[in-house]
Amino acid sequence: MSEYQYNKVTPEMIEKFKEIAPKRVLVGDEINEDFTHDEMAIYGKARPEVLVEATSTEEVAAVVKLCNENKVPVTPSGARTGLVGGAVSIGGGVMISLTKMNKILGYDKENFVVKIQSGVLLNDLAQDAEKQGLLYPPDPGEKFATVGGNVATNAGGMRAVKYGCTRDYVRAMTVVLPTGEIVKLGATVSKTSSGYSLLNLMIGSEGTLGIITELTLKVIPAPKSVISLIIPYENLEDCIATVPQFFMHHLAPQALEFMEKEVVMDTEKFLGKQVYPKELEGTEIGAYLLATFDGNSEEQLEDIIEQASEVVLEAGAIDVLVADTPALKKDAWAVRGALLEAIEADTVLLDECDVVVPTNKIAEFLTYTKSLEAEADFRVKSFGHAGDGNLHIYTCSNDMEEGEFKKQVAVFMDKVYAKATKFGGMISG
């Protein structure tokens, strides 16, 4: 936190907040414990002095303006699914919850855009778009995050390998600036070449430049056919080495994920259901690729499956298992979707390293993290987006005392981020 000296919320301010948002202002111990931390409580807890549950841009603006005039800190809050403590009110002050701003305001199907309030959950938008025959392509792992939070962090996700990140689908937004001023950035049209791109400056700014309250998002026609492939390998090295082959052969997976056997087994145990084979024809499996392809016809997908199968088998895959029914595809992706939840359930304390490295460095990078695990008292588990090199590395405390765990993890993180930088990678989350 900066050394800037903020003021405390006064009783007079609380009364004004109650005028702005009647019956939606909580003070002190009235505020639920859930608002003191995000999904990664290891980054600390702090209770805001006041919680305001806003329902409109105008309410957000009025609260922010009052706080600015009185030098009181403001923390915007969505679904609180973040993993880096960004929504924790470490300076006290006022937290503005946007979860009640959850309306899908309407579609413009001729221009392929949808307008929403920023508190809409990603899962709700995805399902609603599907009913319209449309697809909102960004697909972060946490489906119950707010879309505003996705925009504030420029979230990526499984489909980023083909469709890009959240930034690529934001056409316009309404933002409340720190002064309380309401501004509209961007436009419905796809090309805006004039002036500075303040829209893109706001995307990924995590609430530090303003609070996003409304969004106009690009959507696309939903593909008519989607199919997934489970591709097992003897080891992670062969698994990752296959990834460039997809693109060299002009295959364009909608999603391309890697998972090591240990993490898959733990997750299946957590879910109480076995989906992935552990051995095929006497060969022990060490890692998997989970690939999804989409197209406009079954025939097109059949050609893709045939070509993809030839490519991966030649590259060292043990077999190719086709999830060609909705149930099989759902089960395959349910395991991928529950990886983090299963890891969380199996440890007392957890921390995450989120990096992106060149795809040809994934295996070497993960081998390095495993070598560091041998030097530490905690466990390391990993999975990620093979198609774009975005890796999620989790440190699990076992029975370690919290202080010692944090101390060892700090050393681990320094080494891991340094190695990622050496490989030409970056912090990605």
Regions found by a protein language model. Give the residues of each.
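Short, acidic (Asp/Glu-rich) active-site segment that either coordinates a divalent metal cofactor
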Residues: V84-V88, V94-L98, T146, T208-E214, ...
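C-terminal substrate-recognition/cap domain of FAD-linked oxidoreductases
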Residues: V27-H37, P232, I240-K415, K419, ...
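Glycine-rich, histidine-containing beta strand-loop boundary motifs that form or position
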Residues: P76-R80, A87, S118, P140-G141
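FAD-binding subdomain of flavoenzyme oxidoreductases
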Residues: K103-E257
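N-terminal flexible segment immediately upstream of the FAD-binding catalytic core
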Residues: M1-K65, G82-F112, V263-V275, P326-E352, ...
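Structural detector of well-ordered beta-strand residues that form the stable sheet scaffold
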Residues: T75, K115, L135-P137, K381, ...
